[in-house]
Amino acid sequence: MADTRRRQNHSCDPCRKGKRRCDAPENRNEANENGWVSCSNCKRWNKDCTFNWLSSQRSKAKGAAPRARTKKARTATTTSEPSTSAATIPTPESDNHDAPPVINSHDALPSWTQGLLSHPGDLFDFSHSAIPANAEDAANVQSDAPFPWDLAIPGDFSMGQQLEKPLSPLSFQAVLLPPHSPNTDDLIRELEEQTTDPDSVTDTNSVQQVAQDGSLWSDRQSPLLPENSLCMASDSTARRYARSTMTKNLMRIYHDSMENALSCWLTEHNCPYSDQISYLPPKQRAEWGPNWSNRMCIRVCRLDRVSTSLRGRALSAEEDKAAARALHLAIVAFASQWTQHAQRGAGLNVPADIAADERSIRRNAWNEARHALQHTTGIPSFRVIFANIIFSLTQSVLDDDEQHGMGARLDKLLENDGAPVFLETANRQLYTFRHKFARMQRRGKAFNRLPGGSVASTFAGIFETPTPSSESPQLDPVVASEEHRSTLSLMFWLGIMFDTLSAAMYQRPLVVSDEDSQISSASPPRRGAETPINLDCWEPPRQVPSNQEKSDVWGDLFLRTSDSLPDHESHTQISQPAARWPCTYEQAAAALSSATPVKVLLYRRVTQLQTLLYRGASPARLEAAIQRTLYVYNHWTAKYQPFMQDCVANHELLPSRIQSWYVILDGHWHLAAMLLADVLESIDRDSYSDINHIDLVTKLRLDNALAVSALARSSLRGQELDPGKASPMYRHFHDSLTEVAFLVEPWTVVLIHSFAKAAYILLDCLDLDGQGNALAGYLQLRQNCNYCIRALQFLGRKSDMAALVAKDLERGLNGKVDSFL
């Protein structure tokens, strides 16, 4: 009887990938004795035939001691080997740093890790995704270099040693892809499991669970290669463990960067649209502690699951899978930015093959996420919105021709950066959802009866339509749930904050205008009961504005709320003096959280000035806008600048999370001040104002450039004194983020802009000081400029833009020094 199995199952990997007929011999034992084990295609194209590897494994098996062939013996052998391998994985040892148990990246990784990220979607469960996997395209870009990622797997991991040659990407997909598709529940479970103990990336229990999973050994029942089933099962276990560990590492990086920053930037206390702006909920206080969660990502997924009526329809099964895939790939692309090299320092010297392999991984992850987001542009989903926001913060890999074509000047690099497009897409969708949510709230409020004396009560007896009392309207889950309402408010405020910063940096128009970003109320304007409408002359009623209507988001709202801190016991705000270090941890966290919207307000004022300048506003309007902007700047200088200076002076004494928060916040603030100086210079140059601001421009630029250089110096101080010393941030953060505090920054381009702008300003000052006799001042300026360049070199490990700008600045600084000497 003829063999009914598919001929493709008899083919080697290269022939199956190339869809060629494989003429490998059927009697492989005889062929091995005759020395013919490769098919003609592999011989012709000089490929490594799979049957070469199989023959070598069979030869090793013949030389080993004979084993029993009974089913019981095979089962015992199969189950004992994974347990032995699991025992070789080191158990995390407790130390004074409580560091995550991640191995050093310089340990040699097994050969089977090659190409593991050739298709980034394999890190998650996308076996039946609506978006094509493009596995064959991914196979063409596979690199032969060793995989440089820190997988938390020791180099002598015995499960992978049996493979002398790596499998092709197609074979990797067959091993790595599980039999089910992603959904919101899987994502939430994955996020919650990852954040149960942020200090752990992997543990031996997870390995034992993988080893005991009976599904891993299903290959033993396959009719193909029964004598090598043990090897294939062990390889499957190793790959599955590597995939799980890779996922945990990437999720850990996302957690330690994005969610860490959002726990400070985005709270119910500093969100103007939140119902709980007067106090900080206990859950948010816990988010400031050492064990924070993936709060926003989890809440966005939960909101998306119950927002059917808000979007107007339910998502189809394919749309749900596409949304989950887009969010997963956005997180993968975001986390893939951070280098995994063991070498430390700004002058990183990485072998060319490893550097090329890592760049290929980053490029593939970025392209996969971009394609997934392009396929989901028409899907009304909060997961897609959040994925666009995350991806807009992700730096792409620049090709060599792109680097030479755009040059290294910061303005050219920003002009060609396409990241704002994804952020604008997210903000337009958020704005649409907010409009729908406001309508739903008004419909819910409409069921309440108006007070006596109103139009409704006057005509109640004439136009009233009876309704069954038993059919009481049901509130929508989003409207009824305080958590979902708060999540929607936080999402909208997150989009507004990023839109404001992006518009100021890239000099692009705002997606959501000042009027559309005001606080909206579902309740109609209150009308006094004693003032009914005069039906004779239709005199409009007097309206009593609510507290929210008195609050202008871009007025002095944040300046008033920042003067008080939340009192958690009475759920009120109490007046507090400006925070100074040393202080309690919670006081420091609350001060930084309250300062965040003030920073956003300055960016908004800068954007308003840019808009007025573009529209050709009158000198009086421009001057009034300038004074409003300077009022915000002076408020920060009096309220928060002393605390920031304390943090810079005591950087190494600060808790790790306070370090990460203040460095990012201070860098953002000084960039806004330098952008303000640019706008004022444009106003003076074009003679749009009757007042000359040249002295103010000079002071703003120099003061803030020096402040940025001091920020870089404080962050780099530990590396200068002891390059091998572990950073205090090593206690709570993934080791890819711990070398210097500003590596935690999720929005890399903002700090690139800040450090680069400060360095360019200091370079210009070198021309002025170099003409004088103040040698000490010249040397100090040169040193400060060098601090900014070194900070950019560190950021260049995850951003080509930073590396290019650092090289350009270094050439400029060397030229200035040569001319001075």
From Swiss-Prot:
Pfam families: Zn_clus (PF00172). Zn(2+) 2 binds at residues 12, 39, 42, 49. SUPFAM superfamilies: Zn2/Cys6 DNA-binding domain. Residues 13-31 have a biased composition (Basic and acidic residues). The keyword Signal does not apply. Induction: By ethanol, threonine and acetaldehyde. Expression is autoregulated and subject to carbon catabolite repression. It is found in: Nucleus. GO terms for cellular component: nucleus. It comes from the Eukaryota. Keywords: Activator, DNA-binding, Metal-binding, Nucleus, Transcription, Transcription regulation, Zinc. Residues 12-49 bind DNA. GO terms for molecular function: DNA binding; DNA-binding transcription factor activity; DNA-binding transcription factor activity, RNA polymerase II-specific; zinc ion binding. Zn(2+) 1 binds at residues 12, 15, 22, 39. GO terms for biological process: acetaldehyde catabolic process; chromatin remodeling; ethanol catabolic process; positive regulation of transcription by RNA polymerase II; threonine catabolic process. Positive regulatory protein for the ethanol regulon, alcA and aldA. It control positively its own expression and possibly in a negative fashion the expression of the gene coding for ADH-II. This is Regulatory protein alcR. It comes from Emericella nidulans (strain FGSC A4 / ATCC 38163 / CBS 112.46 / NRRL 194 / M139).
